[in-house]
Structures are given as structure tokens and as C-alpha cells.
Amino acid sequence: MSERAADDVRGEPRRAAAAAGGAAAAAARQQQQQQQQQQPPPPQPQRQQHPPPPPRRTRPEDGGPGAASTSAAAMATVGERRPLPSPEVMLGQSWNLWVEASKLPGKDGTELDESFKEFGKNREVMGLCREDMPIFGFCPAHDDFYLVVCNDCNQVVKPQAFQSHYERRHSSSSKPPLAVPPTSVFSFFPSLSKSKGGSASGSNRSSSGGVLSASSSSSKLLKSPKEKLQLRGNTRPMHPIQQSRVPHGRIMTPSVKVEKIHPKMDGTLLKSAVGPTCPATVSSLVKPGLNCPSIPKPTLPSPGQILNGKGLPAPPTLEKKPEDNSNNRKFLNKRLSEREFDPDIHCGVIDLDTKKPCTRSLTCKTHSLTQRRAVQGRRKRFDVLLAEHKNKTREKELIRHPDSQQPPQPLRDPHPAPPRTSQEPHQNPHGVIPSESKPFVASKPKPHTPSLPRPPGCPAQQGGSAPIDPPPVHESPHPPLPATEPASRLSSEEGEGDDKEESVEKLDCHYSGHHPQPASFCTFGSRQIGRGYYVFDSRWNRLRCALNLMVEKHLNAQLWKKIPPVPSTTSPISTRIPHRTNSVPTSQCGVSYLAAATVSTSPVLLSSTCISPNSKSVPAHGTTLNAQPAASGAMDPVCSMQSRQVSSSSSSPSTPSGLSSVPSSPMSRKPQKLKSSKSLRPKESSGNSTNCQNASSSTSGGSGKKRKNSSPLLVHSSSSSSSSSSSSHSMESFRKNCVAHSGPPYPSTVTSSHSIGLNCVTNKANAVNVRHDQSGRGPPTGSPAESIKRMSVMVNSSDSTLSLGPFIHQSNELPVNSHGSFSHSHTPLDKLIGKKRKCSPSSSSINNSSSKPTKVAKVPAVNNVHMKHTGTIPGAQGLMNSSLLHQPKARP
């Protein structure tokens, strides 16, 4: 009991000492030193370097008087090792004082060093300094650690400490110390404790170190950094199973090595050599997944490998089989001057410096295309050879890395994403070179973003990759063909991408023209609203719809400005309408009404749209207008003018009644123009001539710009009318129906039937239309009669004779004022028409089929004869006159 109590008492102070701070330990050291000075040193050398046994908690019963009585004897037995003061002496005092009194000599670092020197041979356990904790770890008995053997002194050292060891012990050596970053060196060596079965005892560790030193004692001290680079790249994922193979010719010999590598000291060869050696290493590894991160540098292509000028040069060479790779490298690494010139394969332009033909590929970017085309001696034309060369390169790419083409597929359609993710694990286990991952990652984004703007080098790729359909892509994880083609073009496209060839040759890194793109992403619960666009909630649906509509409207509006003559004339007409309204004198009230009438001429299409804006004005002219004209022609004079102009413009090539009606309402003008342009072309031949003429006249009344636009339309319509024998139509149909809306060409047929009822107050417009018809636009036989009726204005019999076919002889219906205004405007129009129709006298007659009358068609704006708009009519007359004057210029 006494010995046990004494041990317990001694254990408690040790525990307290461990808990005490550094200051307490220092004080204890000082006190212990004083005690040692007072007492003679113990006869035997102390082995305090052994860590004390784990302390035991003191029990209250152990501290009784019995323990105190036997403590002296216990100290006597243990005194040789630990001269600890008796707890009785320290009764009532804090344990810190007892710790100071019972300072353990082995605690001091200096004493430890001395004891190591004296008893290093006999030590069982090595004491470790706290300063060395980063080197040895927190718990060396259980930590995994790695050792290297110094070839100078055969000492086993941890890699983290190797540099300092070399500097300390062998700094006098002529060779410079080999600096090894701890992380990279650490990866060289598998844990010895694990490889030896995970033993935790120090003796086992030292013995394993001995094995290491024995196996690598013949190794040289220093390895070239390149050798070390390869070590780092290829030996990272080491496994204890392969311990038996320990290579001998290296300084930092890893305890485990996967495969022996014969490094080439040549800088360029080193990088390329890593390519072939990697595949074997990786395939033999148990955990190939670790490989990719461990080989960042070796994947960099050597300059020779980039000779082909491909955007992503390295992948083809690195991804080939080792044998193939070595052969390819030999060819690529040949200097340009050493190649044998072949005009069918090489650029062939004579180099001014060397006086020899250039031996770069046909896609050489040093010499211009014209220079390369001028080279003599090719078996085929240069362009043919270039196309063949590109095709061959693409085929090679397809054969070389079909796997790397697959990843792009999922990128285009996320549904295949699961196959893609499952694919990646496959690739590594099957020995795919880690270096592959880089090239093929770099090339991934390009194929899957055909919708994105591509760099100038990729137009051909875009054309090739865009057609690929996403469905085949995700049908199976490995469809090589669809996906491979774009990717192969990425790396082999040498047409447009070759401008970068020169700069690429100087780069030692892969690059991509796009921002990084995810290989795949989760689309669970999402809706696809476009290629690559997925929506995960519906909160923004309304906003998205509104935005889409706005964009569509904007694009459609812009479209009209860019469309060729037909649409352009339509738009000018609409613009002119406001001008005429403003400028038409009061005497030309009829002119403004004409616009309304024109609006009604396209009643079939426009009736609904036009009626709403201009319905108010109809009642004033209701008596003059037929029932239909009342509805559609009731529109305001301005609107009617616009509609008239639109109808005339639409009539030029393809504007049917629908087109003419569009202008009636400002909102509807653009859509009508679109419709008219579409419809006009099909029916131009038959009835367009009349419509075109009307449109041209009305547009001429408007701004000069409109006149220009209308002139092409008029010409077109006139030609179509002549072809369709518009002259016959114009004479009969116009006189019978007085088609108010001569503008719509295909409606012209309809106008003939409906024009009689359509006659409206727009006498002036009718007169203008009649003139247009005379100029060679026969009355529109095919246009809807209802629209013509609405557009037509009451015109005198004389007016109707004027190729105002759309306007039926309803002059009697029209009020006297409107009739007078019409005649007034008609006279100047006739004069103007005569001027314009210098070349075609037949234009005066309704039957004129020539295109010149079309220009006269601009006059129709004057046709608005509705009495209500007398105020606006004066301006309209002025516009009519001006338009007539300008029409000759507008002729195409």
C-alpha cells in the first residue's frame, strides 16, 4: 500500500506539472537545479528522457498518514530516478510549489541534448522538442509520416527537414542544396507506419527507416530538379502493396515507387516524355483519381508540339498511345528547316531569309493566302488541298480522342449530365492520361456554346457544331460522332483559327476563348425556355413575356427599315400621311378624306383596325360612302390619308387591301406594311400595278424620303401590272367600280367588284388613283371589293374616268365642296401626272400598264375629299402637287 500510495502521490504532481504553464515549468527547473547543486548527483546517469508513465489520479484514501510514513522509503527506492519532495513537506501549499520543488531534470531542452549525446546509444525513446512539432507531427506514434535517406550520411530524415538537414550537415558540399517544397516532397513517400501494418511503436518506425536506408544507401545525394518533377508527378498516388519495388538511383528515394522512369534531362523532352510515361503509371495505379491534380506541369506542351497551330495543340499529341505519341513527337519536333518540302503539304512560299520554300503546313499564317495560292507545283488547286488537309486533321482528331468529344454533348443539353458525371470516373480507371483532362476541359466549352458569340477563329466550328441536335447527344453517354465533330474542329480547325498559330507556338499553356463553363449542371425541376436557358421558378414569367413582346415589336419595327423597296415604300407612305394632312389646304379637304377612303379601301384587312380610329369621321361622309366605306372610311382624314398612302404603297408589289388598311391607324401601320409586303409579292402581277401607282402618288405628296421609297415600289408594281395586263383591268374595273383604293395590287381584282359600293368622299384620292391606273395600272381585279369600297371616295364621272378605278363614280353622292375640291386637286394632279408620264403617254389613259403611272400614285393623298376634313385638305392639295412634281425624281 505504501509503495502504491507513494507512486500515486508522485503521479499527481506529474499531472499537475503537465497542466502548469510555461512559467511554472521554468521556475521548477530553477528550483531543481538549486537542489541538484546542494545534493550530490545520483550515482547512475539519469534517464529522464524517457517519457514518464501516464499519471494516475490520487485517491483520497491514498493520502492518509500511512502514505506519509512510507513516502520516505518510496523516495529512497525511486530516488535514483526522481528525487521528488515528500508531499508532507508541502502540506497546505499549492501544487505549483510542489511542482517547482520536484522539477524533472529531463524537461529542459539543453539537458535533453546533453543526455542524448551521452546516452544516445542506449535510448529507447526519442524526446522531441516542441519546436520540431511541425516536422514530426503532433503525435508521432500515430501520425503517418514519410522518410528520406540522405545519401551523404545515410541518415533517415523526414522530407520536411531534409533541406535544413542538408544545409546544416552538408552545406560545405559543392552541390547546392535541393530545395523541396514540403507538400510536393511529402507526396513522394507513403506512410511508413501504414506500410508496415500501421504499427505505432517507435522501434518499428526506426526499423522501417533502417530498411529504407539500406535499400537506398547506394542512391546519390542529389537529384536534378527535373527528375524530382517527374517523381512528384508520377509517384504521388503510391500504394504500400508495391513497396517491394524500391528504385535505387535517386536521392530522395520514396519508400514506395509505382514504376521506374528513365528521365530525360533535355528540357523539351522532359515535358513530352511525361506524356507517354503517364499512361502506364496511371493505369497501374489503384487510385487513378489522385492523378489529375498531381500532374499540373507535365501537361504543358513543348513548343514543338504546337507546330500545327491548333487552338488546343497539346491534346492530340498527349492523348495518343505512347508509341504513337513518340512517333508523332519525332515528326513535330523536327525543325522547319529540316523538313523535306512537299508542295502538296507545305506552305511553299519562298522565305526571303533562307531562300527556301516554307515548310509550314498549308494553313501557314506567316504568309498570306494569295502568296500560298501562287505557289507552283501543287498537284491540285491550293483551296482543294487546304480543304483536304483540314478534313484529314479532323478525321485524325476523331480517331485520336473520341472520348474527349463526348463531354461537350452534355453541355449542350443538361439531361445527359448524369451520363457525363458517370463517365469521368470511367476515364481515369481505364488509364486515361490525366494530362488529357486539361486539353479536353479546355475544348469543352466551345462546342456547347454555338449560341454564344465566338471568337473570330471559330466561325466554321460554329457552323459545324450548331446543327448537332441535343437529343442524339443525350440518347447515350457515348455517341462519338455528333459530338466529336465540333470538338475535333476545335482542336484541328486550321482555317480561321490559324491566325493564332504563331502566337500559340510561343505559349506553353492551354487557353480557351470562353469563360469557364460547367461540364454539367442540375436541371431538376426546371423548364427549358431556350437552348441552354433553364428556369427554376415561375415568378418572372410575366416579366419575361413582357420583355419578349417588347423585343419582338422592336425587332419588327426595325425590320421594316431594312426590308427592300416594297416595305420601304410602305413605311414612307405612312410618314408622308401626316405631312400631307398638315400641308393640305382647306380647298383640299377632299385630300384628307382621300386618306380616310384609302384606309377603307383595305377594309377586308383593315376594317377592324381602321374603323376604331377613324369611325367618327365616317358619319360626315356616310352619305357619299357605301356601307362598308362608312365603317372603314369613316376614319379621321389624317388616318384616312395614311391608310390611303399605305394602301397605295402596299399596292406597289404585294400590298393587298390589308396593307392599305394598316396605315389608317398609326398603330396598325407597321403591321399592315408587313402584311402588305408579304401579300403584295404573290399577287403583284395582276393587281399590284394599280395599287403601286396610288401608293407612289400618295407617298410623293409626303416627304421626299417617302417619295424615294415609294418610287421603287411604284416601279415594281407598275411592272407587275403590265405583266398581268393591268391595262385591261384598269379601264373596265376602274370605270365600273371607281375603285377608291387603287393602291392594293392584289385587292385590285376585288376592287373591280366592290369598288362601286366603296365610292367615298375621297374624290381627290380617287382621281389620283384613276390616274395611276391610267399610267398602266389596270383596275385591281383581284383585290377585295369591300376594301376598295371603303377606300373609294365619291368622284365625278370625269374623276372616275381618270384611273381612279377604286373610286366608283359617286361624285354625285359627294357634297359639292368635296367634288370641287377633288376637281381642283385633280387638275394639278393631271398636269403633274403628265409631267411624270413624259415617257409613257398611255399613262394618262386608265389602261396604261407602264410603271410610270405608279409614281403618279403618290397623288392619292389628295384624294381625301371628305368634307369634314376640309381644314386639312388644303395641306393635302399642296402635298399632292409637290408629290406630283417630285414623282419623276422618285422614278426608279
From Swiss-Prot:
Residues 16-38, 195-222, 640-669, 716-730, 840-851 have a biased composition (Low complexity). Residues 616-629, 685-695 have a biased composition (Polar residues). It comes from the Eukaryota. PROSITE patterns: SCA7. Residues 493-502 have a biased composition (Acidic residues). Changing residue 344 to N: Abolished cleavage by caspase-7 and attenuates formation of protein aggregates in SCA7 degeneration. There is a cross-link at residue 257 (Glycyl lysine isopeptide (Lys-Gly) (interchain with G-Cter in SUMO)). Residues 670-680 have a biased composition (Basic residues). One of its GO terms (biological process) is positive regulation of DNA-templated transcription. Residues 1-15, 318-327, 389-403 have a biased composition (Basic and acidic residues). The record marks 266-267, 344-345 as: Cleavage. Keywords: Cytoplasm, Cytoskeleton, Disease variant, Isopeptide bond, Neurodegeneration, Nucleus, Spinocerebellar ataxia, Transcription, Transcription regulation, Ubl conjugation. Residues 39-55, 405-419, 448-458, 468-483 have a biased composition (Pro residues). There is a cross-link at residue 257 (Glycyl lysine isopeptide (Lys-Gly) (interchain with G-Cter in SUMO2)). It is linked to Spinocerebellar ataxia 7: Spinocerebellar ataxia is a clinically and genetically heterogeneous group of cerebellar disorders. Patients show progressive incoordination of gait and often poor coordination of hands, speech and eye movements, due to degeneration of the cerebellum with variable involvement of the brainstem and spinal cord. SCA7 belongs to the autosomal dominant cerebellar ataxias type II (ADCA II) which are characterized by cerebellar ataxia with retinal degeneration and pigmentary macular dystrophy. This is Ataxin-7.
